[in-house]
Amino acid sequence: MYVYIYDNFLRAKKYASVVKAMEVNLTDYGIAGKILRLNNYIDAKPIIDDEIKRGAKTIVMVGNDQTFGHILSRAATCECSFGFLPVGPNNSIAEVLGIPVGVDACEVLSRRRKERLDVGWMNNRYFVSQLHVLPAKVEVFYDERFRVTTNDKMEVVVCNLQPFFWKFNKKDTDLRVVHPQDGKLEAFLRPLTKTSWWGYTYEDPSIFPFEEMEIRGEEPFAVEADGKVTKEIKVKIKLAHSKIDM
């Protein structure tokens, strides 16, 4: 049995036609199912667990990158298969997974092809898209061999499934991208140097794959992972291989 979890933004009128067309296609393919609406303030895991008890075998997320991260970061341990129907903008994860945005995604889902996805593990919780440490005075240790420090602040981004787009500065016209790698987490480390009383200048970043990382700060620093922001003094990050059936 299929259960479809719609993100709340799909209630907007501009998405009505594509959502209706997708529902028609799913019925034609014989994989229509129960529809639930996602509230961003509700943990998806107990809802999914309850649907599994009622016989659900496949949970299909309908939305964008934020939908994908919000649900899977909380429900990665659920005993079911997951699917994804991307709708609208902000769907870089769909591109990585090779899923077209909109109605054509229904055909991909109907093929029932399964893969195992890696997820990131951070301080006893999962993240599936990317983790972002906002500029702070931190030091980084990775793969138990290397240490990275700066005199001032450092920005850290760890990519699992979602690419990270960046520029050298505000005047830079070229948009660069950090692509995730299979079997590895991808790190983006960029030091900041203080140039004035209020200002900082970004230095050239370091980009590399890794398996385990620890980020430490003398004071709590902000960490954003799959849309959830927390304050941490130390973050341990590693890859959980083949955690999600999708």
Please place each PLM-identified region on the residue numbering.
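Structural motif
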Residues: 6-9, 64, 131
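Phosphate- and divalent-cation-binding pockets in alpha/beta enzyme and binding domains
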Residues: 70-71, 92, 224
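Catalytic core of DAGKc-family lipid kinases
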Residues: 76-174, 179-186, 191-193, 200-202, ...
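Periplasmic-binding protein-like
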Residues: 57-63, 188
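ATP/NTP phosphate-donor binding region
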Residues: 1-59, 69, 73, 77, ...
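Short beta->alpha connector loops
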Residues: 40-42, 64-67, 194-195
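ATP/nucleoside-binding phosphotransfer catalytic cores, i.e., glycine-rich phosphate-binding loops
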Residues: 189-246
